[in-house]
Amino acid sequence: MFPMLTGFISYGQQTIRAARYIGQGLIITLSHTNRLPITIHYPYEKSITSERFRGRIHFEFDKCIACEVCVRVCPIDLPLVDWKFEKDIKRKQLLNYSIDFGVCIFCGNCVEYCPTNCLSMTEEYELSTYDRHELNYNQIALSRLPISIMGDYTIQTIRNSPQSKIDEEKSWNSRTITDY
């Protein structure tokens, strides 16, 4: 009977210890609920992108001739081009086009070498998601034009600030060799 009593006592001690550990974890979890988020948007204003900025790729399905030049010039063979050969018109018919921006290095080779100019770089650079599979864009997602950064109020106030007007006057007064 004595070994059975010690078994009950050790079981009770283990149960109390487990409840205490669960309680400590719960207290730590509840103490973090009132904290501010760790990540914040930085910079606070959206950046003004340059004219030749290489952001998300825009794709025009109607212009594509499924030549696969974009796949050949891509250093990582990234664009996936599905097509079938139409015998009656003797041309390739594009079925599907997709790019995984989780893998893309934004080199711009596909845009530069496209013979029909169906690819172009946009000024959209905020592509972060919680799931990496959401970065795989098909032809429908690629054909959507991004929301223009120029419509943003913070960008407009920066461009209309007195400092930017002074900089514009300086740029008009100073000429370089390329301006002539």
Swiss-Prot record:
Topological relation to the membrane, as annotated: Peripheral membrane protein
EC number: 7.1.1.-
Subcellular locations according to the entry: Plastid, Chloroplast thylakoid membrane
Residues annotated to bind [4Fe-4S] cluster 1: 64, 67, 70, 114
Binding residue positions for [4Fe-4S] cluster 2: 74, 104, 107, 110
Cellular component aspect of the GO annotation: chloroplast thylakoid membrane
PROSITE patterns (UniProt xref): 4FE4S_FER_1 (PS00198), 4FE4S_FER_2 (PS51379)
Keyword Thylakoid tagged: yes
Cofactor(s) of this protein: [4Fe-4S] cluster
Quaternary context: NDH is composed of at least 16 different subunits, 5 of which are encoded in the nucleus.
Family from the record: Belongs to the complex I 23 kDa subunit family.
Official protein name in the record: NAD(P)H-quinone oxidoreductase subunit I, chloroplastic
Organism of derivation: Sorghum bicolor (Sorghum)
